[in-house]
């Protein structure tokens, strides 16, 4: 009996010798292969293995599919630790290699498994050759491994998803009367031909023992090899099996016929025959024969791949004696071999590449893709020699070409009980979800294809398609498969054509702008034509049942989704209207208005029967109404009674929303832009039935009206949050923030003048004012501030740096008069990617009058500002960048009185001051899109008083003098606390006020410093100044070293 013969590996017996080459390790390889450029992958390494181009592997690589993340299993002899497998090979055997001896005791290494593994997945590193799935990992186990480790069961339970089997049982070879091998004219031995009926019968006799062995971890011996394969297939693995090297008149043996006993695993089984480089079946290759319905062909003749060889370290013999003496080395290299053993790993590599390409597909579906996209060879269709044909990665990466049922298999090759499934069930699970849970091949779907994928092949066959999972599948080809199409979850987008009926149920959605035979949307099923806005064509009937959904997208230019069918039956269902908002309206000066538009959303040639239940917009500011007109269903859009400011939550938001409300236009764009919606005279009295049940008359003609881009963008809001985000960005708060900051930071000028006067009076002040004996002085200014946002206004950050200069002189012995100037630069970072900068030029007068211990100080300053602002507007699909340059001026007057109270321990000065500040900006004209703002000349003022106490003291030691100073004050603001600016959108007159962060009514003034006199010429100083309140915090720090020469 065939199965009782000793298993032996189908090496390259009778197929000639192979060459051997060695390479050394290389520097890090820079792959020239590029996405979208198949020819860039054809390097010297690629071209050394002719099978890669024969299966069009370069097209898969150019799409980014290389087997990455996939693990290949190999059942063979032990795989050598070759550099081509560095970091990617796991061995599950007992650690020994396969060696053989001839009659003279010469020893050789069994590198068959090494050669096979290289064809499937050798690395692409610029050296030698590379495998089909060069980024895949490999797990290898020995076919005959009689140690304590059960490597085959470990392989079944591993992450390997495809298992290569390049082994088999050879038939007898005919011999002459002398016992010598009979050779055929082509140089091949004359193998005894297997007989189909006998092979299948032998398989059936082994069925019970094979099945019993597969139901538990598979032991070695007996029928364990076939039990291993059956168990692996039922655990979700794809089994790839070499057909055998028993001449092309022969057929595969019993192991390859396992699906005849177990048809449930046929879809997980692939037999592979050997092609020459001329696309002919090799004379050595067994034909597909009875396995034709699950057989393919692949290159297998003279294939260059990884090998190993035993070599003597001493130049002596390579035999058992030398091995025992340790004189032999096992060296990796490359060589050529031929046989179906070399063809099978091509298909294994193809499967790994496709498993990366279609991460959601099961092994049986990958098998279907491989078979149905194979290039037909020989007799048209499935045939005895080539089966489905030569594997073709270029086509395979574009999805299946047939949904197979038994009707698609020629009767002579049909395996009873196989291809029983009528539907190809594809689960596009959504990114991050689990596929094939509870199996050894369970995995998390993490690539982009898990959420969206497209198949571009033309799909035929007697089967149908069932779409499940939350993701989207797009069919781009001309699909003529005869089975039904079901959409049970997620989205099926028909952008080519599907001849069959489509049934949509549960949470499924039919979309696209192609053609279907007919569709029926059941409860919870949805139809959403187009990809964006488009038309779905239906050759026959479009049917909506109660509880179904028709999702219609409309645009402001009169375009809308549409269904074009022969007939429509409306048994209920809802029309859900959404607005196309992919267009950036803010980049336009004028937009077509959505309001008043009439759309045709369903058109037929033979009539509409019934009505939809309702129409449901998901927008608070628009409402829709349906219009039934003979063969068509129309839809109109009008404004609801809700005002924009009804969804605003703050005064700034409400102010902007009310201004946008005034932007609604009522004039047509142009006469030629009018779009008429013709209504037959008999239908003029028809009423539009809105979702609220109100009857509204249909206008005979609707014109496209010019709308303001901002107004039109507001119509698409679905929530209060969207409106609030938009109004905050449109408000132009940065201008109010800059005005507020300039008023706040005017204090640095009056503080500097006051400090200089106190310094000249002999009071201890900060040493950051550097003065000479002639009254000239200078001060470097550096500060930063923060305004805390509130419910109405976002906060902002400021920084100011610059220099102030002055000159003063004593007047009448008890007074002083001076002037100051300077330059500072203020930077402000506001909310929502807005910022501003101001170049500030200062001029001021100051003076004092002393009455003994009492000092009266006063002054005034004037500042010219050159302001640059920039702000971003981004909400939904809308985006714009607005910039402005304008001038402003700040003037202030201040007065202070202080009383000097001196003691031996500390010097105190109670003080009180009063300041008035007036800010005025010139016209504001932003440059940008529709969201650009303008503002007239406007001004605002502030009055503040401060009561406080200054103190200083000094310690003298033998080597240094230390002086401490401080100031504590209470500041009070008078009048209104709001800091606001009036703005309006360009080309409109509707003004609105935008508020910055309000000023705190009361706040604290803090100053502290220390001076350390190192010697009579050097003084080291450090100081801090701050204004702190609930809404604003301004801080400055100064440090310096003064050296007198």
Curated annotation (Swiss-Prot):
Entry's Gene Ontology cellular component terms: extracellular region; outer membrane
Domain of life where this protein originates: Bacteria
Propiece span(s): 646-1045
UniProt signal peptide: 1-27
Domain Autotransporter: 769-1045
Enzyme superclass (EC): hydrolase
Family matches, as Pfam families: Autotransporter (PF03797), PATR (PF12951), Peptidase_S8 (PF00082)
GO molecular function: serine-type endopeptidase activity
Family to which this protein belongs: Belongs to the peptidase S8 family.
Identification of the protein by name: Extracellular serine protease
Biological classification of the source: Bacteria, Pseudomonadati, Pseudomonadota, Gammaproteobacteria, Enterobacterales
């Amino acid at each position: 009996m065939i199965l009782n013969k000793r298993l032996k590996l189908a090496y390259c017996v009778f197929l000639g010798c192979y060459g051997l080459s060695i390479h050394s390790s290389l520097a890090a390889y820079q792959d020239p292969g590029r996405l979208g450029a198949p020819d860039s992958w054809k390097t010297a390494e690629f071209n050394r293995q002719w099978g890669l181009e024969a299966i069009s592997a370069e097209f898969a690589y150019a799409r980014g599919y290389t087997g990455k993340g996939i693990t290949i299993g190999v059942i063979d002899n032990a795989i050598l630790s070759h550099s081509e497998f560095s970091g990617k090979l796991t061995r599950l055997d007992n650690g020994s290699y396969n060696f053989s001896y001839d009659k003279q005791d010469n020893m050789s290494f069994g590198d068959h498994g090494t050669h096979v593994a290289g064809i499937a997945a050798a690395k692409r590193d610029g050296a030698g050759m590379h495998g089909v799935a060069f980024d895949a990992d490999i797990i290898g186990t020995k076919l005959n491994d009689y140690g304590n480790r059960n490597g085959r069961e470990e392989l079944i339970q591993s992450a390997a998803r495809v298992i290569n089997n390049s082994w088999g049982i050879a038939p007898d070879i005919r011999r002459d009367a002398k016992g010598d091998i009979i050779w055929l004219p082509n140089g091949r031995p004359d193998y005894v031909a297997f007989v189909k009926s006998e092979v299948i019968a032998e398989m059936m006799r082994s069925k019970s023992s094979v099945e019993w062995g597969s139901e538990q971890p598979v032991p070695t011996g007996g029928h364990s090899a076939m039990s291993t394969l059956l168990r692996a297939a039922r655990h979700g693995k794809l089994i790839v099996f070499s057909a055998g090297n028993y001449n092309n008149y022969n057929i595969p043996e019993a192991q390859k016929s396992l699906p005849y006993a177990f048809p449930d695993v046929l879809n997980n089984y692939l037999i592979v025959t050997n092609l020459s480089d001329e696309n002919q079946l090799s004379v050595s290759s067994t034909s597909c024969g009875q396995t034709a319905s699950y057989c393919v062909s692949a290159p297998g003749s003279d294939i260059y791949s990884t090998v190993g060889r035993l070599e003597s370290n001493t130049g002596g013999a390579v035999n058992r004696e030398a091995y025992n003496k340790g004189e032999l080395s096992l060296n990796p290299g490359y060589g050529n071999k031929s046989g179906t053993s070399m063809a099978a790993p091509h298909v294994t590599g193809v499967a790994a590449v496709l498993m990366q390409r279609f991460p959601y597909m099961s092994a049986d579906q990958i098998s279907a893709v491989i078979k149905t996209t194979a290039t037909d060879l020989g007799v048209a269709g499935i045939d005895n020699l080539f089966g489905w044909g030569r594997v073709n990665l270029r086509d395979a990466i574009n999805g299946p070409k047939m949904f197979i049922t038994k009707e698609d298999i020629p009767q002579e090759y049909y395996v009873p009980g196989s291809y029983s499934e009528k539907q190809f069930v594809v689960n596009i699970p959504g990114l991050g979800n689990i596929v094939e849970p509870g199996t050894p091949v369970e995995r998390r779907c993490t690539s982009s294809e898990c959420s969206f994928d497209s198949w571009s092949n033309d799909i035929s066959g007697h089967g149908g398609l069932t779409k499940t999972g939350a993701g989207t599948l797009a069919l781009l080809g001309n699909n003529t498969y005869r089975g039904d199409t079901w959409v049970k979850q997620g989205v099926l987008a028909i952008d080519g054509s599907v001849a069959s009926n489509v049934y949509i149920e549960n949470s499924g959605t039919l979309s696209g702008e192609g053609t279907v035979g007919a569709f029926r949307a059941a409860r919870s099923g949805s139809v959403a034509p187009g990809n964006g806005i488009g038309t779905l064509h239906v050759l026959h009937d479009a049917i909506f049942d109660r509880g179904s959904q028709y999702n219609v997208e409309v645009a402001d230019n009169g375009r809308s989704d549409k269904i074009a069918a022969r007939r429509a039956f409306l048994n209920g269902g809802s029309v859900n209207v959404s607005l196309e908002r992919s267009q950036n309206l803010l980049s336009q000066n004028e937009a077509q208005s959505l309001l008043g538009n009439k759309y045709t959303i369903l058109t037929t040639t033979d009539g509409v029967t019934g009505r939809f239940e309702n129409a449901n917009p998901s927008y608070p500011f628009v409402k829709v109404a349906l219009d039934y007109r003979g063969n068509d269903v129309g839809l109109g859009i009008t404004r609801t009674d809700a005002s924009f400011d009804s969804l605003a939550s703050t005064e700034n938001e409400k102010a902007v929303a009310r201004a946008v409300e005034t932007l609604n236009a009522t004039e047509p764009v142009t006469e030629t832009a009018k779009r008429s919606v013709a209504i037959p005279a008999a239908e003029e009295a028809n009423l539009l039935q809105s979702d609220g049940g109100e009857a509204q008359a249909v206008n005979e003609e609707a014109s496209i009206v010019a709308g303001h881009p901002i107004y039109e963008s507001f119509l698409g809001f679905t929530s209060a949050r969207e409106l609030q985000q938009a109004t905050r960005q449109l408000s132009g708060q940065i201008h109010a923030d800059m005005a507020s900051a300039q008023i706040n930071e005017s204090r640095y000028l009056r503080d500097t003048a006051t400090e200089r006067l106190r310094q000249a009076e002999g009071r201890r002040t900060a040493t950051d004012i550097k003065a000479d004996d002639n009254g000239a002085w200078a001060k470097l200014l550096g500060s930063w501030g923060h305004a805390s946002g509130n419910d109405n206004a976002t906060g902002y950050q400021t920084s100011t740096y610059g220099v102030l200069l002055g000159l003063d002189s004593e007047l009448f012995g008890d007074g002083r008069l001076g002037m100051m100037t300077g330059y500072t630069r203020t930077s402000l970072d506001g909310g929502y990617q807005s910022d501003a900068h101001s170049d500030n030029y200062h001029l001021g007068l100051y003076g004092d009058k002393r009455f003994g211990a009492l000092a009266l100080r006063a002054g005034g300053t004037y500042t010219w500002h050159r302001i640059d602002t920039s702000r971003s507007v981004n909400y939904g699909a809308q985006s714009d960048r607005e910039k402005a340059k304008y001038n402003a001026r700040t003037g202030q007057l201040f007065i202070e009185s202080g009383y000097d109270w001196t003691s031996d321990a500390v010097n105190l000065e109670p003080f009180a001051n009063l300041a008035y500040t007036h800010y005025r900006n010139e016209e504001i004209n932003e440059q940008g899109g529709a969201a650009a703002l303008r503002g007239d000349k406007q001004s605002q003022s502030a009055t503040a008083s401060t009561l406080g106490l200054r103190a200083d003291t000094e310690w003298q030691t033998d080597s240094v003098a230390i002086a401490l100073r401080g100031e504590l004050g209470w500041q009070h603001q008078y009048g209104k606390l709001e800091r606001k600016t009036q703005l309006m959108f360009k080309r409109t007159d509707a003004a609105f006020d935008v508020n910055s962060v309000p000023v705190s009514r009361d706040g604290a003034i803090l100053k502290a410093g220390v001076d350390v006199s190192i010697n009579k010429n050097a003084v080291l100083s450090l100081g801090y100044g701050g204004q702190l309140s609930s809404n604003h915090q301004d801080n400055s720090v100064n440090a310096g070293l003064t050296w007198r020469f």
